[in-house]
A protein has these predicted regions:
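Generic structural signal for short, solvent-exposed loop/turn connectors between secondary structure elements
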Residues: 1, 29, 162-164
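N-terminal secretory signal peptides and thylakoid transit peptides that target proteins
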Residues: 1-14
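Aromatic-enriched hydrophobic runs in primary sequence
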Residues: 16, 29-31, 43, 150
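Boundary at the C-terminal end of the N-terminal hydrophobic targeting segment
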Residues: 19-21
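Short N-terminal helix-initiation segments at or just after the protein's N-terminus
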Residues: 24-29, 96-100
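N-terminal pre-domain segments of enzymes
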Residues: 25-41
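A short Gly-Trp-Pro
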Residues: 36-39, 45-79, 85-164
Length: 164
């Protein structure tokens, strides 16, 4: 393989990786059609706290163990803090020991995934299907029945208790 071939191959791989990282696809093909919520950066900053903005709009990560939602055990729904879309039922939550609220699945059609190469090794990142807000990453070390762990930034969620 010549140097030119080698450089061409590396360039192609880089372009393919970037395209893969930017392509969002639904995590589940089922569920109701969700109308997108598109706001300007200024509108998001008015709507969200600085911590929420940092995670939801800038794909940041909150410190492990800091979310009050880690200990949330009531029946209810975990919604996107950016747009109120229900993402997880409380029955989907489990204690992962990671310091972040964790779920073994999401509500149908509620999240979209994409490949994330920020830490060099690819990971699966997930976003709210309505507003595109970053919530966390999906790992393949969760409990049955899915074997998945949706590791969520608590600041990106709000909990709505089930009506009594």
């Amino acid at each position: 393989m010549t140097r030119r071939d080698w450089l061409g191959l590396l360039s192609s791989l880089g372009i393919a990786a970037k395209a893969s990282a930017q392509t969002a696809k639904p995590a589940a093909p089922t569920g109701p059609k969700i109308e997108p919520l598109v706001l300007s950066d200024t509108e998001w900053k008015k709507r969200l706290t600085p911590a929420q903005y940092g995670v939801l709009r800038e794909e940041g990560t909150e410190r492990a163990g800091t979310s009050p939602l880690n200990g949330e055990k009531r029946k209810g729904t975990f919604q996107c803090a950016g747009c109120d879309l229900p993402l997880f039922a409380s029955s989907m939550k489990y204690e992962s020991g990671t310091g972040w609220p964790s779920f073994f699945t999401s509500l149908p059609g509620a999240v979209q995934t994409k490949r994330d190469f920020h830490l060099v090794l690819p990971r699966t990142e997930y976003h709210c299907a309505r507003c595109g807000g970053h919530h966390g990453h999906v790992f393949e070390d969760g409990p049955k029945p899915t074997g998945l762990r949706y590791c969520n930034n608590g600041v990106a969620l709000k909990f709505v208790p089930e009506a009594a």
